[in-house]
Amino acid sequence: MAVKERVGTVVSDKMEKTVVVAVETRFPHPIYQKTVSRTTRYKAHDEDNSCRVGDRVRITETRPMSRQKRWAIAEVLSHSPKAAAAEAKAEEANQ
């Protein structure tokens, strides 16, 4: 059986080792043929707490880790420009 994968954007990183990833699906309406977009939010396991809000990530389906968490971060595709600027600013303040 193939492993399910999704690509989405991190919308919340306030939990410990967990992020909320919004995945947008686009499809034509069956009758009117207008493109409809639906957003599904998945809770995903982030072992290193490396994801920030705005990051594009790939998630894969895993065993149940908690009541609502059944996905894990496979890789970070791109970091958010805001998060990168905030990290650089924090690094300058520490020096």
Curated annotation (Swiss-Prot):
Keywords: Ribonucleoprotein, Ribosomal protein, RNA-binding, rRNA-binding. Pfam families: Ribosomal_S17. InterPro entries: NA-bd_OB-fold, Ribosomal_uS17, Ribosomal_uS17_bact/chlr. GO terms for cellular component: cytosolic small ribosomal subunit. GO terms for molecular function: rRNA binding; structural constituent of ribosome. GO terms for biological process: translation. One of the primary rRNA binding proteins, it binds specifically to the 5'-end of 16S ribosomal RNA. Belongs to the universal ribosomal protein uS17 family. Part of the 30S ribosomal subunit. This is Small ribosomal subunit protein uS17. The lineage of its organism: Bacteria, Bacillati, Cyanobacteriota, Cyanophyceae, Synechococcales.
